[in-house]
Amino acid sequence: VSPLLRAQETLAHIQTYFKDVPVLLCDKIKPDDDAREAVEWLSQIPYESIVVVCHMNVVGHIAELLTHENFNPFALAEARIYDQAVIANGLSTQKNSFIPTI
């Protein structure tokens, strides 16, 4: 999760449903950070399934690197599900997406 306030607020909401999930703070997934550094950091995480709580534009650029598809910005509060054996450039496939409604 990003250290910035909005990501921390989103994390707090997620934790109301998933109380015992480990949380890792990452200073490489803020809006203007380098997506390549973020992917490198994410590739070191020792979990089979992860949730990345961060910001545009970096999350769009992370998705671009992982899928080798053109940059596609996320909608506000959008969640996307990707499948990959390992986190590495070009090895992910988007499986689904979700935009919450009020």
Q: What positions do the PLM features span?
A:
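Residue-level signal for the start and early helices of compact helical domains
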Residues: E9, I14, D20, L65, ...
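Domain-level recognition of soluble alpha/beta enzyme cores
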Residues: E69-T93, I99
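Phosphate-coordination/substrate-recognition cap region in phosphate-metabolizing enzymes
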Residues: V1-E48
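Low-complexity, flexible helical/coil segments
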Residues: D34-V39, V58-E64, V86-S92
